[in-house]
């Protein structure tokens, strides 16, 4: 059996002087094997678990995280689940897989467990409803549908997961060049608008200005950038443009949604259709705008290989002025041992589409992942896995995770006065 649980020999039966006996005390060695993408948010969870987790049930619990590279994460997890090997007790699953693996019988329905446990109920009530919608419900319920019901847990709704790491994408930018007086003056002179320097400037940055930034900061080797001659070619902007996994759809969807298009007709479930929706005139126009900015990006953008890790590396190597990437990849940017721009980087909201009233629509995908339990665990392991969920989603652990580059989906934690100051991208996340 792949489930690893060994009962300890702590059946301690003592006879007291009165002749009464102490009831048997059972504890266990429990190993929870968890599939997880290999990146900072999951690495921190493992490190913090090993340092701080104590089982409330008295078990000796080991969290054995199987770290899998992102590009092959889905294939590896899917192969394990469909093989029948029953390797994992928990999985950090991307939310877009939820329905497929629930239908396959691999992910455990947690609805009754949540309803019977006041701690789990309180956690669910504190989670941002957009995350409950994306990470937990199947069949999928929108945030609006959940809020209309009004109860948490909502009657008639099935719940499967809790957030391990709720992610959003933000703008990473070089403050030393975007706030350089000479560059700011030249940009203003060329385009008649300001070069975004502050967080507030990025709040008012749309896709048109994003393209202007890309054009403006395209410099060749030997050109001056912020008064310094360049040793290599330099590019103004970059965002996801990769063929692997979801390394382009997570950006293209934003263009489509912001302009009023969609990628499929969800109202026709369970026979929802994409034909005529994702290739509508509105969606095609939005996709063309996405493509139009690739001309200002490094040559790798033309190869289908410019994924979230490639743009992160380009930024850290000082070859790009601004990127749009996930918060989960922000921490290495600030690491002096890994990043040439660790002391020059700042963060702001991602650009969006300007509306007729002057506002900016930043509708986009929710990133991040829930963790789920698999369906073949014994009751004792299910209970301990849920204890791990409670430990991870208590406010003390969540604030520690945020301080180390993670994010929280708990509204109480995001409302904490210290939250925005814990990491430089937190304001944009909230």
Give a label for each model feature.
Residues 4, 8, 24-106, 112-125, ...:
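Conserved N-terminal structural module of periplasmic/extracytoplasmic solute-binding proteins
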Residues 17-25:
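C-terminal segment of classical bacterial N-terminal signal peptides
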Residues 95-170, 227-230, 255, 346-351:
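Hinge/lid segment of periplasmic solute-binding proteins
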Residues 209-218, 245, 249-305, 350:
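Glycine-centered hinge/linker elements that transmit conformational signals in sensory
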């Amino acid at each position: 059996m792949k489930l690893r649980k060994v009962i300890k020999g702590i059946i301690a039966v003592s006879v007291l002087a009165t002749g009464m006996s102490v009831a048997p005390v059972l504890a266990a060695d429990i190993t929870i094997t968890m599939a997880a993408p290999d990146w900072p948010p999951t690495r921190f969870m493992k490190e913090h678990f090993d340092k701080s987790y104590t089982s409330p049930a008295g078990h000796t619990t080991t969290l054995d995280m199987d770290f899998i590279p992102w590009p092959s994460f889905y294939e590896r997890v899917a192969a394990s689940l469909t093989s029948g090997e029953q390797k994992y007790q928990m999985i950090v699953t991307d939310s877009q897989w939820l329905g497929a693996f629930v239908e396959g019988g691999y992910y455990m329905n947690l609805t009754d467990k949540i309803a019977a446990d006041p701690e789990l109920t309180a956690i669910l009530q504190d989670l941002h409803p957009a995350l409950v919608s994306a990470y937990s419900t199947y069949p999928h319920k929108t945030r609006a549908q959940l809020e209309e019901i009004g109860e948490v847990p909502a009657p008639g709704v099935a719940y499967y997961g809790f957030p391990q790491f709720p992610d959003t994408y933000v703008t990473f930018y070089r403050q030393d060049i975007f706030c350089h007086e000479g560059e700011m003056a030249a940009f203003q002179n060329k385009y008649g608008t300001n070069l975004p320097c502050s967080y507030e400037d990025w709040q008012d940055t749309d896709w048109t200005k994003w393209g202007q930034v890309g054009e403006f900061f395209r410099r060749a080797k030997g050109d001056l950038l912020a008064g310094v001659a360049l040793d290599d070619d330099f590019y103004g902007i970059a965002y996801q443009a990769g063929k692997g996994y979801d390394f382009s759809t997570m950006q293209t969807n934003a263009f489509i949604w912001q302009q009023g298009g969609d990628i499929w007709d969800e109202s026709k479930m369970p026979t929802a259709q994409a034909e005529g929706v994702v290739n509508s005139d509105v969606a095609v126009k939005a996709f063309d705008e996405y493509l139009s900015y690739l001309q200002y990006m490094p040559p790798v953008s033309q190869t289908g290989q410019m994924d979230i890790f490639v743009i992160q590396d380009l930024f850290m190597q000082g070859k790009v002025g601004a990127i749009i990437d996930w918060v989960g990849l922000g921490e290495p940017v600030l690491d002096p041992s890994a990043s040439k721009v660790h002391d020059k980087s700042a963060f702001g909201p991602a650009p969006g589409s300007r509306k007729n009233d002057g506002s900016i629509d930043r509708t986009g995908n929710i990133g991040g992942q829930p963790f789920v339990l698999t369906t073949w665990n014994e009751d004792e392991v299910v209970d301990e896995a849920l204890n791990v969920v409670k430990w991870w989603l208590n406010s003390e652990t969540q604030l520690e995770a945020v301080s180390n580059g993670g994010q929280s989906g708990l509204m109480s934690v995001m409302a904490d006065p210290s939250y925005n100051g814990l990491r430089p991208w937190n304001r944009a996340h909230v």
